[in-house]
Structures are given as C-alpha cells and as structure tokens.
C-alpha cells in the first residue's frame, strides 16, 4: 500500500480526528487501513467517544460549524479540503452509542 501525499497535510487530518475524539471523551481510538476496489487505499479512524448528534452529522464538514463550546469548527472542513486536494474523500460512516467512524479514501 502506497499513498503519494503531502505528509504534513495528511498528518493534520489525523491530528484533527484524534483531537476531536479525545474532546468527545474517547478512551480508545483505532486506525486501520485496507485496499479497496480499484486500488483505493481506505483508512478508517474509529473511536468510542460521545457520538456526534444526528442533527449535526450532515453539517460537520461545513466551515465554522461546531457543536463544542470551545471549538472553532474548522478542523473537519480543513480535513475535507486536504482530502479533495489529494483526489480523495473523507466521510462520517457512523456515529452512535458504540462508535464513531470516519473513512478516508485515497484514489
């Protein structure tokens, strides 16, 4: 598995996702990678913190949208732009009482 990407920018995505998980009270964060169809590289970042409210799930990638009192609301929007710049995607796969899972897909 090989991804050609800007290391600093991709690191920023992981920093944003891990920071959000910790702010949500996560005790466990799992990062896994696999090959997808057509040689896509898929990375999933899962945590057991408080779920993202259903009412917010469609808006979390909008710049300056936040559900936190102290949040700026730019972390996930920056992460989405970084993925777009790398011809990839980031999406929220699920967020419920058991787990919140984000998926990064590199094409």
Where are these regions (language model features)?
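Conserved micro-motifs of the catalytic ATP-binding
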Residues: 2-5, 67
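A residue-level detector for a conserved hydrophobic packing site
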Residues: 10-11
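Detector for a conserved hydrophobic position within an alpha-helical segment of the HATPase_c
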Residues: 83-84
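Short beta-strand/loop element within the Bergerat-fold HATPase_c
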Residues: 28-39
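Short alpha-helical Gxxx[C/S/T] motif in the catalytic ATP-binding
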Residues: 75, 79
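Acidic ATP/Mg2+-coordinating residue in the GHKL
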Residues: 47
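Short conserved segment of the HATPase_c
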Residues: 52-63
């Amino acid at each position: 598995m090989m991804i050609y990407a800007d290391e600093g920018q991709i690191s920023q995505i992981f920093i944003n996702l891990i920071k959000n998980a910790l702010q949500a009270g996560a005790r466990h964060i799992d990062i896994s990678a696999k090959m997808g169809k057509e040689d896509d590289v898929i990375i999933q970042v899962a945590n057991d913190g408080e779920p993202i409210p259903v009412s917010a799930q469609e808006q979390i990638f909008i710049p300056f949208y936040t559900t936190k009192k102290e949040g700026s609301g730019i972390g996930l929007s920056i992460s989405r732009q970084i993925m777009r710049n790398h011809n990839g995607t980031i999406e929220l796969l699920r967020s419920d009482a058991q787990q919140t899972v984000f998926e990064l897909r590199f094409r």
